[in-house]
Amino acid sequence: WSPIGDVTTTMLWMGEKVSTIELIRLLIVPSFICMVIPTFIASLLKPFKGNFDAPPSEGEQNSKGPLMLYLGLSLIIFVPIFKTLTHLPPYVGMMLSLSIVALVAEIISSRQFSITSVEGQLEKQEQSHHSSPTFGALSKIEMPSILFFLGILMTVAALESLGLVFTFGNDVQKTIPIDLFVILLGAGSAVIDNVPLVAASMGMFPDLAMDNETWHFIAYAAGTGGSMLIIGSAAGVVAMGMEKISFFWYLKKIGWLALIGYLTGAGAFLLAQQYFF
């Protein structure tokens, strides 16, 4: 329900298919229902009952960590506000936010380096070298993921330039209701990455005006439908690797809950469009 909450929603926002205010107004309730219903059902099931004991933290915590966390989150939220006030492209606001975070990180890191050097807690070879947090963060950028999305978007753009995407969109509108197509698109995002699906849909319906209900429904479907399979979202893939969650365990324990949440949220959106908006 936020223009920066999912990469596909950000694509629609940057493509001027949806606006911030209308996106929040139309999707916050369906998104809330999509979250609450499966969470409530899961709370009644035995595997999800009990207390969770967090493992003890290892290593010394940085006292400036909370400051950087809150600063980063605040500046991310600032991006839609910046676009609304200045009417500049969203990437300008994001780069401005990044530069502020990098500047503050460098200032804090330089001060901590100076203090520890004075106190004599560093070795001689370490005193002559200051590790930049900005350079350290840049070295962790996942270039394969960036190139993956670049390849996907270029492929869709090539198909769009040939007119194939537009032709397919016309055939879809003549064959099935567009709302049903959007629901199937959300389900398909659990198998196929949602980025190419949304990029293709933006080329299928070029005549739809900004803030048309279809664009908002696509934002909801693509953003939540991928959770039905663990491989359908970037967060699921990361969790599968970090927590060793198997594909079939997720499908058996979580997949049906995600399906219920997805369908109830979609139903809430369609009912709201029918009777309230």
What is the predicted role of each segment?
Residues 141, 221, 254-258:
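Loop-to-transmembrane-helix entry motif
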Residues 31-43, 69-81, 97-106, 149-157, ...:
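Hydrophobic core segments of alpha-helical transmembrane domains in multi-pass membrane transport
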Residues 2-9, 77-83:
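C-terminal ends of transmembrane alpha-helices
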Residues 1-2, 11-13, 18-68, 72, ...:
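Juxtamembrane and boundary regions of transmembrane helices in multi-pass small-molecule transporters
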